[in-house]
Amino acid sequence: MKSETRFQILVSVAALGMSMLTGYAASQTPSNTLASPDSFASISDTGTRSAAMFTELGKVLTNPRCTNCHPAGDRPHQTDASRLHQPPVARGPDGHGTETMRCSICHGNANFDPGRMPGHPEWHLAPREMAWEGKSIAEICAQITDPARNGGRKVEDLIHHIGEDTLVGWAWHPGYGRSPAPGTQKEAGALVEAWVKTGAACPAK
């Protein structure tokens, strides 16, 4: 084998190996961290790269900090184990509770760690059309990209909602006794923005 041919083969093998390692690093990040959009640069197909970034974001969307307030029914869940809220409460007509049991009766403007009580000025449940408790990442993606099932929202709206909304941001600062969502809000926002800019493709499963 000529030295030039041998060199070309070695270069090709090395490039393939680096590509595989980069893809592995992006898809195998620990469950409590988030890969950056740059981690997916080795995926040449734009749609595949976009779907891969949403899959990474799915670590946040399927975390109890999110699913507890995006329930399939009208009762929120609580704790890392996603138990039904105690005392029993209901969504109510506006997501802020019933007339006699408003969320704000117990949930103040900020976390109250001595009582393990989470809080935020706008504490409430997500709208019914944004319920994704028990759904796969692919099903969540299909739902939030469909205006008929997401309250008429554009995918671009998610850049601000996930990346900057302070109630969503609570998920990364949930207070005593609760595990935060993976990564940081800034990292999640960067993934959403990159996902939208690459076509907002959904994973197949």
Question: Regions from the language model: what does each represent?
Answer:
Residues 70-72, 78-82, 114-119:
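Short, solvent-exposed loop/turn and secondary-structure capping segments
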Residues 2-52, 64-68, 72-77, 193-205:
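Post-cleavage N-terminal segment of exported redox proteins
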Residues 39-60, 76, 80-96:
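Electrostatic cytochrome c docking/interface patches
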Residues 1, 18-20, 53, 101, ...:
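Detector for methionine-enriched segments
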Residues 48, 55, 64, 111, ...:
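C-type cytochrome heme-c attachment and multiheme electron-transfer modules
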